Swiss-Prot record:
PROSITE patterns: BTB, ZINC_FINGER_C2H2_1, ZINC_FINGER_C2H2_2. Belongs to the krueppel C2H2-type zinc-finger protein family. ZBTB18 subfamily. Residues 197-212 have a biased composition (Low complexity). The gene is zbtb18. SMART domains: BTB (SM00225), ZnF_C2H2 (SM00355). InterPro entries: BTB/POZ_dom, SKP1/BTB/POZ_sf, Znf_C2H2_sf, Znf_C2H2_type. It is found in: Nucleus. GO terms for molecular function: DNA binding; zinc ion binding. The keyword Translocase does not apply. Keywords: DNA-binding, Metal-binding, Nucleus, Repeat, Repressor, Transcription, Transcription regulation, Zinc, Zinc-finger. It comes from Xenopus tropicalis. Residues 190-230 are annotated as: Disordered. Residues 214-230 have a biased composition (Polar residues). This is Zinc finger and BTB domain-containing protein 18.
């Protein structure tokens, strides 16, 4: 005949005895807290206590638990579970209960705590996602409201329209001829120094048009005030003439070229890009490949799209190349704008007269970006770095062997080289099998001194490697590793989950400080 309620009645009686202190044969210390209990109950519910009492049962009246891992409230909760079979977290953190259960090897409690932590993490992730969605919606609404409020402010006035009509007049062939045929170019800055392909140029032009038409765009009509300010900043925007020199005097040519270029600059943009040089001549001739790309702009508002480009002044190049470029551009302005007409490539060599203008080519600070190997000049350090890589790419490959008069420690058997004779001697032991380090206690020999030091612990009976979970000590780090794998694997994994959830240091960083680093190799 079975009595189903017998087990429950037994637990109830044991719980009453524990509260009364009747027949309690052990005391568990967690920090300053004392817990009276029965050894049989503790050993039946916890593998930690089972192993603790297995060896010396009569000498283990007091049990000390690591208060850094097990807290007093968490152990009190687990102790109630042992005697009553009920687990009530109350207001305790689940992480503390998980750490205590892992320390005591109560794996059923560990599984429950892990499940609750996963549910908690999922709930927090869902709530965070909802908050982010709500905030993104509110940001979109604010953006739309700001765009509608700035709509009226972005509309140009009547005077601006008149100025815009004056500025948007494109010069014809006669204008280009009478105005010394000056062309104004802009070199790309560091952030835009990578050459664009044809498809990218089309996309950039289309994007510029959309930006100019959008109500939220920061580009507006070019007023008379902005033109005046551009003339005042002549000391910053250093310019050079790209065209054929006319019969005017030096001062008149400079003034006319500067004024005429201001009008051309508002309507056209020639982007000069420096391509990578693959080789260098023996005579150190300064040569640089340029891709000149000219985009005809219909509206003046798009003249501010490429603000990052700085206007620079280049030395004169060959007459026939410039004339062909001007004629080609004039013909393209009469036809519809197509990708073929928008991109015009011209490859020329820089004249040696560029070198006197080096301080004006580059940044306003006067920095010189010149290749130290071939003396070529570049507009930015980024392009210079790309050019230098072409030199070093040619030198890649097998390292040249040192001169014959330089002695390098080399193994005579396998030909391997070393930095010093000490490492060579250690390497030679792998071929000869020599074991110069001998233990004075047992006569065992080793190839390396650190192996002898590790072996000496066997004779001294020292146990420097301590387990953080059960405070057992071991002579070798490998024994400690096998012990953790066998008895504390669940605890290590659970604390790994805990550290990832709470953003704590990894288990390897704070649980095994006293053990050897070879444990985790």
């Amino acid at each position: 005949m079975e009595f189903p309620e017998h087990s429950r009645h037994l637990l109830q009686c044991l719980s009453e005895q524990r509260h009364q202190g009747f027949l309690c044969d052990c005391t568990v210390l967690v920090g300053d807290a004392h817990f009276r209990a029965h050894r049989a109950v503790l050993a039946s519910c916890s593998m930690y206590f089972h192993l603790f009492y297995k060896d010396q049962l009569d000498k283990r009246d007091i049990v000390h638990l690591n208060s850094d891992i097990v807290t007093a409230p968490a152990f009190a909760l687990l102790l109630e579970f042992m005697y009553e079979g009920k687990l009530q977290f109350k207001d305790l953190p689940i992480e503390d209960v998980l750490a205590a259960a892992s320390y005591l090897h109560m794996y059923d409690i560990v599984k429950v705590c892990k499940k609750k932590l996963k549910e908690k993490a999922t709930t927090e992730a869902d709530s965070t996602k909802k908050e982010e969605d709500a905030s993104s919606c509110s940001d979109k609404i604010e953006c739309l409201s700001d765009g509608s409020s700035h709509m009226a402010g972005d509309l140009p006035s009547d005077e601006d329209d008149v100025e815009e009509e004056k500025i948007n007049i494109l010069p014809g062939k006669t204008d280009l001829a009478t105005e010394s045929g000056n062309m104004w170019i802009r070199l790309p800055s560091d952030s835009a120094s990578i050459p664009q392909t044809g498809g990218e140029a089309e996309t950039h032009t289309a994007a510029a048009g959309k930006t100019a038409d959008s109500p939220c765009s920061s580009t507006g009509s070019l007023s008379h005030r902005s033109a005046t300010s551009m003339r005042d900043s002549a000391d910053v925007d250093c310019v050079l003439d790209l065209s054929v020199k006319s019969s005017l005097s030096g001062a008149e040519t400079l003034n006319n070229s500067y004024l005429s270029s201001q009008e051309i600059l508002r309507n056209s943009l020639v982007q000069v890009k420096v391509e990578k040089e693959a080789s260098c001549d023996e005579n150190d001739i300064d040569t640089t490949e340029y891709d000149i790309e000219r985009n005809t702009v219909k509206e003046s508002s798009s003249s501010n799209i490429r603000a990052p480009y700085e206007p620079v002044h280049l030395a004169p190049i060959r007459e026939d190349s410039v004339l062909r470029e001007l004629d080609h551009d004039d013909k393209a302005s009469d036809d519809d704008i197509t990708p073929e007409n928008e991109r015009v490539q011209m490859e020329t060599n820089m004249d040696s007269s560029l070198l006197p203008y080096v301080p004006n080519i580059l940044s306003p600070a006067g920095q010189i970006f010149m290749c130290p190997l071939c003396n070529k000049v570049f507009p930015s350090p980024h392009i210079l770095q790309i050019h230098l890589s072409t030199h070093f790419r040619e030198q890649e490959g097998i390292r040249s062997k040192p001169a014959n008069d330089v002695h390098v420690p080399t193994c005579s058997l396998c030909g391997k080289t070393f930095s010093c004779m000490y490492t060579l001697k250690r390497h030679e032991r792998t071929h000869s099998g020599e074991k110069p380090f001998t233990c004075t206690q047992c006569g065992k020999s080793f190839q390396y001194s650190h192996n002898l030091s590790r072996h000496a612990v066997v004779h001294t009976r020292e146990k420097p490697h301590a387990c953080k979970w059960c405070e057992r000590r071991f002579t070798q780090s490998g024994d400690l590793y096998r012990h953790i794998r066998k008895f504390h694997c669940e605890l290590v994994n659970s604390l790994s989950v805990k550290s990832e959830t709470l953003g704590l240091p990894a288990v390897r960083d704070w649980t095994l400080e006293d053990s050897s680093q070879e444990l985790w190799k």
